[in-house]
């Protein structure tokens, strides 16, 4: 729908927004494509750090906007550019009145890494509600997946801004997508409400 490189390019305040954050190559673009039912809405890449802007996608007939944020933890770009992306992301998180939730995507194969935990702390300090969502759940066995979810749940108990009930998804196999869509739908404008 729209790509934003600076705060002055943000769209006018409209429907509620849910942002997707996560380490580079965690599968944000693949998850967006699966949610939208399109393979080409968000560009996927094996190169970490490909997303360098805030990318807006319309979901549920325009009743909710998804915002794909630049990945953290890796970026093959000059330091000044990485710092500019970081400023954009944090300014967006602090100041966007329609931002309702940040879905913090975590690779199910590895669980929460140090930089994921730092982002959880940052979101808690900014009082931005967040929901951890494991990606690539099809690549781990059920026992390991349950253990990862339990580890995250324990950590969430210490985070005031965290929503209970971390989720597990697989963009490739479709596992968990219906439950995730239902969770997102709770933030959408009611059916028939005026949209900008």
Short names for language-model regions:
Residues 1-7, 139-196:
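Canonical P-loop GTPase G-domain recognition
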Residues 14-15, 35, 79-82, 117-121, ...:
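Short, glycine/charged-enriched secondary-structure capping and boundary segments
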Residues 31, 102-103, 180:
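Hydrophobic packing within well-folded, soluble alpha/beta domains
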Residues 57, 135, 180:
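Residue-level signal for inorganic ion chemistry
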Residues 9-13, 48-55, 64, 70-100, ...:
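Switch II of P-loop NTPase G domains
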Residues 87-164:
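Conserved C-terminal guanine-recognition region of P-loop GTPase G domains, centered on the G4
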Residues 1-76, 186-195:
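Conserved G1/Walker A P-loop phosphate-binding module
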């Amino acid at each position: 729908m729209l790509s934003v490189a600076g705060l002055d390019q943000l769209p006018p305040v409209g429907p509620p927004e849910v942002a997707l954050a996560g380490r580079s190559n965690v599968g944000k673009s693949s998850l967006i494509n699966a949610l939208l039912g399109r393979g080409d809405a968000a560009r996927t890449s094996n190169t970490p750090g490909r997303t360098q802007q805030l990318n807006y996608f319309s979901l549920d007939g325009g009743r909710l906007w998804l915002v794909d944020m630049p990945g953290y933890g890796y970026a093959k770009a000059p330091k000044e550019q990485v710092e500019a992306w970081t400023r954009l992301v944090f300014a967006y998180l602090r100041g966007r009145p329609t931002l309702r939730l940040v879905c913090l995507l975590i690779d199910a194969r590895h669980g929460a890494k140090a930089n994921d935990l730092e982002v959880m702390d940052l979101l808690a300090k900014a009082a931005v509600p967040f929901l951890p969502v494991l990606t690539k759940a099809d690549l781990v066995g059920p026992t390991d997946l349950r253990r990862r979810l339990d580890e995250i749940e324990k950590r969430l108990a210490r985070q005031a801004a965290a929503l209970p009930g971390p989720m597990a998804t697989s963009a490739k196999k479709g596992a968990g997508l219906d439950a995730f869509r239902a969770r997102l739908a709770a933030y959408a404008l009611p059916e028939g409400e005026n949209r900008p």
